[in-house]
Regions:
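Bacterial N-terminal signal peptides that target proteins for export
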Residues: 1-8
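Generic N-terminal leader/processing signal
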Residues: 2, 20-21
Length: 166
């Protein structure tokens, strides 16, 4: 009886441990060379927005960092057109703002730059992650939280956007 009880407990522990392991959702190889658009998943009352963003790179880490950068670029310059309509309005309406303030944004989006303060990955155990892997590069779709209100205030303080446009 003790052996059956012990084996049942071990079996349940094994099932619980293996079911919590999450794998990437893998799509076709040829999709790793296709551009994907960001999608707004929702907003929160503290000024944060949740975005499903895509990034490509030679490694998984590079692709995920590029996904964070792409999410921020969409929020700043284009707005996020897919998904929740609350994210459609960009932070700047200035034409060619990226080119006009190129030095500023090159520093902002540099490896380990200030962008890391405004874009964070959600807990990966709770969110889905999509992977498209080709021979040379990988595309990852991850859920990124963008601190939109904080980012807007920083861009106003740095003179990049006009505070009277809001």
């Amino acid at each position: 009886m003790k052996i059956k009880l012990l084996s049942a407990i071990l079996l349940l522990a094994f099932v619980a441990i293996t079911s919590s392991c999450r794998r990437d959702t893998v799509v076709a190889d040829n999709l790793s060379y296709m551009p994907f658009e960001s999608q707004c998943l929702g907003t929160s009352l503290d000024g944060n927005v949740r975005i499903k963003a895509w990034g490509s790179g030679a490694t998984r880490g590079d692709a995920i960092e590029n996904a964070k950068r792409n999410a921020l670029r969409d929020v700043i310059f284009n707005g996020v057109k897919l998904g929740n309509p609350a994210c459609q309005r960009p932070l700047t309406y200035e034409v060619n703002a990226h080119e006009r303030h190129e030095m500023y944004f090159n520093r902002f989006f540099a490896d380990g730059g200030e962008y890391t303060q405004y874009a964070t990955l959600e807990d990966e155990t709770l969110t889905s992650r999509t992977k498209a892997k080709g021979d040379v590069q990988q595309n990852y779709g991850v859920v990124v939280t963008v601190k939109r209100a904080n980012l807007q205030q920083k861009l106003i303080n740095d003179g990049i956007i006009n505070p009277y446009n809001y």
